[in-house]
């Protein structure tokens, strides 16, 4: 995700979608439309993205491993197809999403992120894990998360955050957010709110009020 402005953008030639579409065309000789389970944002690294597409010809229907190998050979080194299988012709990845999970990695010591800097946020301030856990608990559930988006959507901003898990191992902290779906920028803003609670070492229900979150 480091080199790309997201999965799908207006500048299609630089997006992950464009690279994958081009690889499919080069390998199969067919142009196709991609449907992604989640349209990731700039700098987001997707480890389990699901993409569906249709091919008219069945030249690879009996050998998906060969198609996967050829696609990976045609793709940039920082994009990879990890699994490929034939789905029901009615399956559309963008319509089949039940939930998605984002993970925010935080290092409290720059040395702890030496080999994972592109995927890790370095925060040198002292963080109070208990305050972060309390903020996470308040943000879990069904709320109007309008304040946690770029404000450009005309659709409902009510979302259900199913779980927020915070784990710490030495100088590394992971915030794992799972929701039925996320608004644009919502994962980053949720993680930022939890981080703020950890820095200030205090949190109560004003966390929701200050963030503009309303129970739905």
Identify the meaning behind each predicted range.
Residues 1-216:
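Structured-RNA-binding interfaces characteristic of tRNA pseudouridine synthases
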């Amino acid at each position: 995700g480091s080199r790309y402005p997201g999965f799908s953008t207006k500048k299609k030639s630089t997006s992950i979608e464009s690279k994958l579409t081009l690889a499919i065309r080069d390998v199969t000789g067919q142009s196709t439309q991609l449907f992604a389970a989640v349209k990731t944002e700039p700098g987001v690294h997707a480890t389990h993205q699901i993409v569906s597409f249709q091919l008219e010809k069945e030249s690879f229907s009996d050998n998906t491993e060969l198609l996967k190998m050829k696609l990976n050979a045609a793709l940039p080194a920082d994009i990879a197809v990890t699994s490929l299988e034939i789905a029901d012709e009615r399956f559309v990845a963008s319509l089949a999403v039940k939930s998605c999970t984002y993970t925010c990695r935080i290092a409290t010591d720059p040395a702890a992120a030496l080999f994972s800097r592109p995927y890790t946020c370095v925060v040198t301030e002292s963080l109070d894990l208990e305050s972060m856990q309390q903020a996470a608990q308040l943000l879990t559930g069904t709320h109007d998360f309008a304040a946690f988006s770029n404000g450009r959507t005309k659709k409902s901003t009510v979302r259900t955050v199913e779980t927020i898990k915070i784990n710490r191992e030495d100088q590394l902290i992971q915030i794992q957010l799972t929701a039925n779906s996320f608004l644009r920028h919502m994962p980053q803003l949720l993680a930022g709110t939890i981080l703020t609670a950890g820095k200030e070492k205090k949190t109560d229900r004003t966390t929701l009020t200050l963030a503009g979150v309303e129970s739905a």
